[in-house]
Amino acid sequence: MISSCSNTQPPKNKTINSLSLHEQQNMEKKSMILIMDFGDSESQIIKCCDSLLTYGVGYVETANKTISEGDVAWNSAYPIIRKRLGAAQQKTIQVAISKLENTSYRDSVIVKDNVEYTLYVNNHKVASGYKARIKNFPADIQTTIKQMRSWASPLYHKEYGA
């Protein structure tokens, strides 16, 4: 499911990690994935692909330099929220992808009790580091992470009433 760009709702009665034919066909489309690891077994995941933003909670098992649908299992206890992106948001994503697709940044300083960000562009890791040190990230990466979070945050708050 992580590489999917479809707008279908997955079943809610089990952990989801399989791809439909339509989703497999969309795997080659340009995408950005932000994994926010809070130090427990679950991560918040934001994916922007073409005109669709997907937000959910899941488990990232083996992703390192690349990520694929087999590396992520969505936690069925939480809904997967999807939103169509507007034209300006789509353009922002396209520009960010073109700027970041050949980037590589890793902040090696470990910050305990802090959110770890990992950013993938077209399924390849381009950045990782901790939220407390985001000011040390290259400007384009900072902007992209903040933008993806700002688009997903209202969806989460609307869904959970937080």
Locate the predicted segments by residue.
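Hydrophobic/aromatic beta-strand elements that line small-molecule binding cavities or substrate pockets
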Residues: Q44-I46, K83, Y117-L119
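Sec-dependent bacterial lipoprotein signal peptides
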Residues: M1-S3
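Short, solvent-exposed loop/hinge segments that bridge or flank secondary-structure elements
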Residues: D40-D50
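Extended intrinsically disordered, low-complexity coil regions enriched in Ser, Thr, Gly, Ala
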Residues: I46-K47, G58-Y59, K65
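Short hydrophobic/aromatic-rich beta-strand segments that constitute the beta-sheet cores
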Residues: L53-V57, S128-G129
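Short, internal acidic amphipathic alpha-helical interface segments
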Residues: A77-K112
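Short, well-ordered, aromatic-rich surface patches in folded extracellular/luminal domains
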Residues: S6-D40, S104-A162
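Acidic/histidine-rich, surface-exposed loop or edge segments in extracytoplasmic proteins
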Residues: E61-I81, S128
